[in-house]
Amino acid sequence: MKFSSIPIASTLLSLLVASSVTASPLRRRDDPLNGRQFGLLALHSGNEYVHLHGFYVGDSGSVYLDPADGTDDAATFTMSNGQLSVGNRYASVSANGEIVFKSDTNSTSSGFSVGEAISSGYSLKYNGTESAVACPSLVNNQVYQVFFGVGNGNPSCVGIAVLAVLPQPISSSSTYNSTTSSYHNSTSTPPPTITSTKASTVTSTEATTVTTTTAVTVTATETYTVTATNGGSTITSTGASTVTSTQPSTVTSTQRKNTATTTKTTTYVGPSPSASSVVAYTTKCIVVPVITTAASQSEAATPSPSAAVYPLFPHGIRLIDSTKPEANSGNVYSPVVFQKQNNHTNTIFTFDVPQVSGSCELNFHLDTSGFPITVEGVNGTGRFILFNLSSVANDSTVYSNRPNRIAEIGRFNCSSSGCDYATNVTCPDSYTAVSYEMMALTDDSYLSFFEEADPLEGLTLRV
């Protein structure tokens, strides 16, 4: 499945931080990064080689999203008068947008600036735009190189947003302009330090023979811990991914012990997310199959289509507020749904759609294994409803011009323990985009959460 390469500047990115129920930026002093050290993160939902990867400056000065070119550590940057530097080397941007750090100051580029202030840092702009590009490097197509222009021509290049994150919490005495800010207030706390790695292990039983005349269910479970760390603070998220398939009656198979472990570390700099301050985390889930002998493989039933399809995560999440019909939330990281009498805060989710296989399913899942969720309602249960929309939300979508609703998709209840809901939907056309709206069904129903992949939390689409 190929994900869209549409740039996600200022998403996840303003996508990806929502500090309260709307994405209203904090007030900030001029040049907040001037003279301060910070890290840089690439943001692009759905690309495991790009999303939430730190910036590494190689020996040649080129910038990569993984260790490469003689460097093993994510770089620490400073910025002054529009010039971006690492140590005594300064960023120079070539005609095709390649960014290279050089000790020769004669070719230094001065077009870097601070974008929107968000609770975990600031978006980074070049020449007034946030449209950076990440492309597979010429040496290793799993290590991406950073460009602030057209890129190197590789068809797998993707647009990215660049997030500058300070190693300490951003101090601010400002309040959030939100109709429900009094409902949930946020406070800044020092970032914690947590260290671990991401490990995936699959083990099957040594020389075990199974014979049955009824249906046999085989389950593979991937347990994983994802850690993001770099100088400042660390995010750790743990969860599990399970694939289940049913084999036909009368099955005899022998399984061998086979253990495989992989480890991956992602760099993150900045304060730890909370229910009111989070960073976009929507990479692709990885499904690990059961390991069996050739004999058992020949008799195994074909897995169901849903088990073989990756979930799609929204590339855009927007809040619309009936009390501020012209307010533009921008793209946010944390969806919020709320109703108080006639006042609504709804969330619109937009997905990029690859090749459609035939049947489509919308899934909503929340539990307590990921970042904190907040659910309120009568007796602690909120009631919510989903709609499909007549058109796709865009950067100018607000409450007053929101797309029309075509029909109700379904209703679900949610509590502080979470919820799980799935429903078949009309498939969108291949290689297009589609939007869905979530709103509260009853008065005082409230829901906020963090869309993430490890563990899988939030709204996803399978096609």
Swiss-Prot record:
Keyword field contains Cell membrane: no
Sequence similarity: Belongs to the but2 family.
Pfam families cross-referenced by the UniProt entry: But2
Stretch forming the signal peptide: 1-23
Protein name: Uncharacterized but2-like protein C27D7.11c
Disordered: annotated span: 174-200, 239-258
Domain of life: Eukaryota
Principal localisation: cytoplasm
Keywords recorded for this protein, A-Z: Cytoplasm, Signal
Places the protein is found: Cytoplasm
Record GO cellular component, one term: cytoplasm
Protein's organism: Schizosaccharomyces pombe (strain 972 / ATCC 24843)
